[in-house]
Regions:
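Extracellular leucine-rich repeat
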Residues: 1-318
Length: 318
């Protein structure tokens, strides 16, 4: 354990970097770091911390980067031993920009888990939670005053995104929801409030059913990754991708897609990379196709990388 006196001998120093990883730490005592006001980088990776409290990080007002990767106890599956992050545990970290909490078994977020992180730009929560199956409009409410740019939520067994789950994150640029178990129809309201979004990564999820409004609220989107998500309803009209005039990269690979319309990619004049491999598009380019070949690539004047591998194509329309 650390206590308020552990680092008192360093009070005359200007220490900026402290690595406490692999120390079997179980307890971060109140005011442990109060002697280190110049600290900018702190690593507590690979420890057995059982609890963070509102004064665990007191005094670290200049900290820029904090890694809590595998920092918490993982010893038992019983509910009682889940590590606990008290509300306001991060409240003193006014200048923190980077926070990594990957690979832990924390129950979920509370309404003030991240309160006070008013400079936070990068938050990685990959394989962090045990009970985050549903994202709601309260999950990230404590980030409402954080200028967050990147949020990594991979490998959390997330199965549903409710309306407005990210509505607090108006500056977010990159949202990574890959490698989860999301299984739902995308109404579009899931992305409400993401006014600055640049990339949404949804690849490797269970089942996504599209609607014409699936991406209507994120016209700023430039990269959309939908690889291996058992994608359904791609052939609806108007196309789900129609609002995405700024899109440059679209990945629809490994979805066994067989039916699409000519207007699937209509209006995507900025599209540069299209990954469409491992689908079932063979029939669409055959002369014998009812209604003739489906020219779904028309108008894509900026396209310079096109992957149609493993689609069974044996005819290319003239």
């Amino acid at each position: 354990a650390t206590s308020a006196s552990t680092f008192s001998g360093l009070k005359q120093t200007n220490l900026t970097w402290l690595d406490l990883s692999y120390n079997s730490l179980r307890d971060v005592g109140n005011d442990s770091f109060s002697w280190l006001p110049h600290l900018k980088y702190l690593s507590l990776e690979y420890n057995n911390i059982q609890r963070l409290s509102p004064r665990s990080f007191y005094g670290l007002s200049n900290l820029r980067s904090l890694s809590l990767k595998r920092a918490f106890t993982k010893q038992s599956v019983s509910l009682a031993s889940h590590p606990n992050i008290d509300d306001f545990s991060f409240q003193w970290l006014k200048h923190l920009e980077y926070l990594n909490m990957d690979d832990n078994n924390i129950m979920g977020t509370k309404c003030n888990t991240f309160t006070g992180l008013v400079s936070l730009k990068y938050l990685s929560l990959s394989k962090t939670f045990t009970s985050l199956q549903t994202l709601t409009n309260e999950t990230f409410v404590s980030l409402a005053h954080s200028p967050l740019l990147t949020l990594n939520l991979t490998k959390n067994h997330i199965s549903k995104i409710a309306s407005g789950s990210f509505s607090w994150l108006s500056q977010l640029r990159i949202l990574d929801l890959g490698l989860n178990e999301i299984e739902q129809e995308l109404t579009g309201r899931e992305w409400k409030g993401l006014r600055s979004i640049f990339e949404i990564y949804l690849s490797y999820n269970k089942y996504l059913r599209l609607t014409s409004n699936s991406f209507a609220l994120v016209p700023s989107l430039q990269r959309l990754m939908l690889r291996r998500v058992a994608l359904k309803n791609v052939d609806i009209s108007p196309s789900p991708f129609r609002p995405l005039h700024n899109l440059t990269i679209l990945d629809l690979s490994n979805n066994n897609i067989a039916n699409i319309n000519e207007d699937l990619l209509e209006g995507l004049e900025n599209l540069e990379i299209l990954d469409f491999q491992h689908n079932n598009l063979a029939r669409l380019w055959k002369r014998a196709n009812p209604g003739g070949p489906v020219n779904f690539l028309k108008g894509l004047s900026r396209l310079h990388i096109l992957n149609l591998e493993s689609n069974g194509l044996d005819e290319i329309p003239v």
